[in-house]
Design a protein with these regions (language model features):
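Short catalytic/metal-binding and nucleic-acid-binding patches
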Residues: 1-138
């Protein structure tokens, strides 16, 4: 239930911290996820970059090279540095914490996928998921 409260706050937050709505930063973050797939053999088949947070479905494989924490740490570290340069600012960019949820069945994976892809609609940013530009798959 705590997650739903946080999600509601994020979806209705003002735009003072909506740095991910900058197209250059959104592209940067999507590109970093792609890089991590190649580099560490984790898969991120569904990603949505919201104005102030990111949703992704991540799948490890039997040959993933590092932990998910390591992958997310690298994504957050390198994109924070580059995003701050784009914005001309310094300091903290991402929240320190991540929220994760293990999907233990194909049904749950499908539910999480739908949730992720529909998040821009739920936040009233677009009327259809496919209209949101900062997502994977397109």
């Amino acid at each position: 239930m705590e997650f739903l409260k946080i999600e509601s706050i994020l979806d209705t937050a003002d735009n003072n911290r909506a740095f991910l709505s900058n197209p250059d930063i959104a592209r940067l973050v999507l590109s970093k996820f792609d890089e991590m797939e190649t580099k560490y053999r984790w898969r991120f088949p569904f990603i949505v970059i919201m104005p102030n947070h990111v949703h992704c479905l991540c799948c490890d494989s039997d040959n993933a090279l590092v932990s998910l924490g390591k992958v997310l740490g690298e994504i957050k570290g390198s994109t924070a540095f580059q995003a701050n340069r784009i914005l001309g600012k310094e300091g903290k960019f991402w929240a320190a914490e991540n929220f994760d949820h293990w999907c233990r069945s194909p049904l749950k994976v499908e539910s999480v996928k739908r949730y992720i892809m529909n998040n821009p609609v739920k936040a009233r940013l677009v009327s259809k998921p496919e209209d949101w530009p900062w997502r994977k798959p397109k």
